[in-house]
Amino acid sequence: MAIRSLPSSSRCSSSSSSSSYSLASTSLSNRLETIFKKASELCTLCDIEACVIYYGPDGELKTWPPEREKVEDIALRYSQLNEALRRKKSVTLYDFLNKKKDKTNLEKKAKITDNDDLKTCLKNVNILKYPLADHYSPDQVSQLIQSLEPHVSKVRERIRFVESQKHKETKPDHQSLASSSLNHQTQSLNPSQFSLFMYNHGDNTLSQIPVSASNFNQDYFSALLEQSELKSQIMKQDLCGYEQNMCMSNHGDATLSQIPLSASNLNQDFSALLQDESGLMQQELCGYDQNMFMNNNNFQHSFVSNTQDHSAPVVQESVNNNYGLMPHVPCGYDQNLFTSDITNNNLLINNSMFL
């Protein structure tokens, strides 16, 4: 007798099948125990008679309850029932789903009928509470209008009150915006934001003069007004193009002389008008953008220039002044005045802008 060994593939397949069979048998035995337990609980809780008959894969018979006499008695009574009684309380999955669907449809129909009934009831209530005026007589209609007029007037008054409240709520917003804009304008026009500067020709320095908001509008402008009135009483001078005039005031004989200063007559001799032996001379230059270098005893003017390069010939003149330094009062704006005690200085009258 020869014994052959099976191939490895067959051995693997047999081992896998045996393992799956063992797992299935284990799962079946566990489930069988669960079924027997549920049948016992059902009989106890519902007070009924139940039995379980089980045939295994190998033909083994198992029952619950374990007593075979009880199982045979229950099975015999069940077999004597007709088909209708047998299926009276038996439910399959298909039957269960159909019953649930039928129940849902019945509930929907009941809700629809309930809603219809509710609508009809509300309609009847509205008809009884608010009857229609189609069948009213003219007297009844007029009475109805008179009864409604007070309610209408109350509603209109309420509407007016609500609108007035809305306007009151919106007005403060506009007022706050207006006040903020006014404050911004006053801050932008605040005089404290301005400054005055003074230029010192002696050492060529520029110094700032503090200007406060209290005296900016009063002290400064009042002094400026008094000075302008005083100067307007002394002399008036008009400038047109390159035509300029120099006014010389002689306090000795209280006379006022006017010297035309233009590009055509700048080379004329005007030194005789500057000579004064009786008193202090006051020279006032009226105009704008003029520079003047003055001498104490003897001075000479070398040239008189204009912005458009109108140069005059050199004029050498000497003037004797026995009373010292002459006060100079410039009238107008953007003027610079330089005085010196050194002899033989030059007089320079320049019509260029000094910024």
Curated annotation (Swiss-Prot):
SMART domains: MADS (SM00432). GO terms for cellular component: nucleus. Residues 1-22, 162-186 are annotated as: Disordered. Residues 176-186 have a biased composition (Polar residues). The keyword DNA-binding applies. Pfam families: SRF-TF. It is found in: Nucleus. Residues 26-68 form the MADS-box domain. Interacts with MEE14/CBP1. Disulfide bonds: none annotated. GO terms for molecular function: cis-regulatory region sequence-specific DNA binding; DNA-binding transcription factor activity; DNA-binding transcription factor activity, RNA polymerase II-specific; protein dimerization activity. Keywords: DNA-binding, Nucleus, Transcription, Transcription regulation. Coiled coil: none annotated. Probable transcription factor that may function in the maintenance of the proper function of the central cell in pollen tube attraction. One of its GO terms (biological process) is positive regulation of transcription by RNA polymerase II. InterPro entries: SRF-like_MADS-box, TF_MADSbox, TF_MADSbox_sf. Residues 162-174 have a biased composition (Basic and acidic residues). This is Agamous-like MADS-box protein AGL81.
